[in-house]
Amino acid sequence: MSKIQRVAEANLPTEFGLFRIVGFEFPDTKKEHVALVMGDISNSEENPVLARIHSECLTGDALHSLKCDCGFQLSTALRQISEAGRGVLIYHREEGRGIGLINKIRAYSLQDNGMDTIEANLALGFAADERNFKVCADIFELLGICKVRLLTNNPAKIDTMKKAGINVVERIPLNVGENRYNTGYLDTKAKKMGHYIVHDNEKHYLDCPYCQSEIPNKK
């Protein structure tokens, strides 16, 4: 596979402010990824860029599913970049941890019948995580970024960036969106994938609008 190329860009006004949307494409496969850029991201050597690698999740990002934390993480990351006035969000187009949308729906069906997110992937013949984060390092390079402050709970993203020559000088936690539909999913990511997920179940029951009917009875 040939290396990804920067092919298009334009202004993109959003509810979080004005971004530049930059399109990237593999010339042979035509596989596409995009980055949202705010502010002056030059000179990352002296001033590391606030960054988020966000893998595509149609159900969470666009359809507001509560089965995952993806949509919450997307909006929180864009808001934090906007508040900082400078940063990058790479929209990494590997839906369903790399298995695609239809297979993700199949995995959801297996989860409806008792499997966790990892068991469902394995039952369908996939690895727990099929994503390739190396392309994100290539995108950072094409944007002229060498040092980042990375918004993530996923150690694999940090490890891949460092191995590819992108210096992650700080990890910024992104623990948002926990609710009664995704607590088990988040537990699985923490226990089986090593994600840095912090639970405060009592607090999330009290704060989450979807959980008010399920506040545990205190003895």
UniProtKB/Swiss-Prot annotation:
Pfam family name, one: GTP_cyclohydro2
- According to its UniProt record, which cofactors does this protein need? Zn(2+)
Which branch of life, at top level?
A: Bacteria
Gene3D superfamilies this protein is in?
A: GTP cyclohydrolase II (3.40.50.10990)
Could you say which residues bind GTP here?
R52, I53, H54, S55, E56, Q73, E95, G96, R97, T117, T152, K157
Keywords in alphabetical order: GTP-binding, Hydrolase, Metal-binding, Nucleotide-binding, Riboflavin biosynthesis, Zinc
Q: In which pathway does it act?
A: Cofactor biosynthesis; riboflavin biosynthesis; 5-amino-6-(D-ribitylamino)uracil from GTP: step 1/4
Q: Does the keyword Nuclease apply?
A: no
Q: Does the record bear Metal-binding in its keywords?
A: yes
Q: Name one GO cellular component term.
A: cytosol
Q: Which GO terms describe its molecular function?
A: GTP binding; GTP cyclohydrolase II activity; zinc ion binding
- Which Enzyme Commission number(s) are on file for it? 3.5.4.25
Q: What sections of the protein cross the membrane? A: none
Q: What does this protein do?
A: Catalyzes the conversion of GTP to 2,5-diamino-6-ribosylamino-4(3H)-pyrimidinone 5'-phosphate (DARP), formate and pyrophosphate.
Q: Which HAMAP family match?
A: RibA
Would you tell me the protein name for this molecule?
GTP cyclohydrolase-2
Q: Which organism is it from?
A: Mannheimia succiniciproducens (strain KCTC 0769BP / MBEL55E)
Q: Which gene encodes it?
A: ribA
